[in-house]
UniProtKB/Swiss-Prot annotation:
The keyword Disulfide bond does not apply. Keywords: Membrane, Transmembrane, Transmembrane helix, Viral envelope protein, Virion. The chain crosses the membrane at residues 35-55. Residues 1-34 are virion surface. It is found in: Virion membrane. Residues 56-73 are intravirion. One of its GO terms (cellular component) is virion membrane. The keyword Membrane applies. It is a single-pass membrane protein. This is Protein F9 homolog. Belongs to the chordopoxvirinae L1 protein family. It comes from the Viruses. The lineage of its organism: Viruses, Varidnaviria, Bamfordvirae, Nucleocytoviricota, Pokkesviricetes.
Length: 73
């Protein structure tokens, strides 16, 4: 799951880096950014938030289980 998410993030990141210069040029001329770029940015932010929340939850569970053992010792 995490590996697939990382691969997807890497693909989106490479796609974004390829599209960003063109979109910057378009913005400089007063054009609106393409919807695909906006959707890609939204997808990256959503994936990032989900990944962070999952990591926090996993760390919380581990910490919760580890704490009583540490207190007993």
């Amino acid at each position: 799951g995490h590996a697939a998410a990382n691969c997807a993030l890497a693909r989106v990141a490479t796609a974004l880096t390829r599209r960003v210069p063109a979109s910057r040029h378009g913005l400089a001329e007063g054009g609106t950014p393409p919807w695909t770029l906006l959707l890609a940015v939204a997808a990256v932010t959503v994936l990032g938030v989900v990944a962070v929340s999952l990591l926090r939850r996993a760390l919380r569970v581990r910490y919760r289980f580890a704490r009583p053992a540490a207190l007993r010792a």
